[in-house]
Structure formats: structure tokens, C-alpha cells
Amino acid sequence: MYTLKDDVFKGMRPQIHEEAFVAPQVFLSGDVRVGKYSSLWPGVVARGDVNYISVGECSNVQDLVCLHVADDAPCIIGDYVTVGHGAVLHGCEIEDHVLIGMGATVLTGAKIGRGSIIAAGALVKENDVIPPNSLVVGVPGKIVRKQDRMETIHAQAIKYKCEWAIEYGVKPDIGGELYHGEKII
């Protein structure tokens, strides 16, 4: 589990819920908040130096993700969000039940609506507002259609929560939801 070391920046120290998982290979600095049952995996860098970073409940930030902020833009990640390997989120807002694909980039001031999917490698430009339940692909990112995979996004978040919780001995049954065999039980 993650232990706070010299991660104070201008008097701000990361705040990690006791039932969150942060891998030891993660770098957190400054005003970073990690919610209950969320997980940050090896190689994540989260620097809340000039603004704050907030990861909601039951979200997972996968290997090698970079989370950063701007003077006028925090990085806010909602509940039940999956941020895929190698993504970059900079001073943006990600609403609940969103899937950010591997290698995607979301730039300063962008807002991703609830239930959306940002495809692997996509680029969401500064100040773009993506409506709820959108599928965004490409560089620059374009909305190609509405999507209705909310259950799949939710299941992915539960899967990550359950896998790390069971492995590390944290109570995994938030709200009675468990993940087994590709479904929520």
C-alpha cells in the first residue's frame, strides 16, 4: 500500500481514503484526494501543485496515467470511472460512469459527460464539452454516436474495485455489488 513520504507541496498533502488502494509505485504530490474503494495502479503520477486533483469513489486509474492541473482548472474524476493505461488528464472534469481509453488525452477545461466513452488514443481538446453518453474517437476527438454501455462501464469499475480489494484484504462489497465471471452479482 502507498505510504505518504515527502509528498507535501506548499503545505498540501495527498488525502487517501483508508479503503482506497494506491500502489507503492505511484507518485502523488500536493492536493490530491482519492475516494473510497478507488485504486491508483503502478506508475500513476498525480501532481496537485497549483490546483487540486479529486478521484471519486470506486474509480480506477490504471498504470502510467498522468493527472495534472492548471492554475484555473482542477482535475476532477467522478465515481465509477475507469482511466485506461497511459492516459493523460490535464485540468479537466470527468463525470461519473465514464471510460477513458488507453492513451487518450483530455486537455484543460474539457468536460466529459456522464456515461461517455473516450476511445483509446483519442484527443479531447481544451474546453471541449462532451455531452453525456457520447462515444468520442480520433485526433482531434469527434463524437461519433451516442452509446448505451453504462452497465459495461459500471462493471469495469466494480471489477477493478473487487480485484484489488480481495487481493489486499479490503472489504469489497460496497452496496452489495461484487464482480464475478464478467458480471456484477
Question: Model-predicted segments: where are they?
Answer:
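Extended, small-residue-rich solenoid/repeat segments and analogous flexible loops
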Residues: 1-37, 45, 185
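Generic "edge-of-domain/loop-turn" microfeature
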Residues: 27, 33, 51, 66, ...
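Residues on the solvent-exposed faces and adjacent turns
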Residues: 30, 42, 48, 63, ...
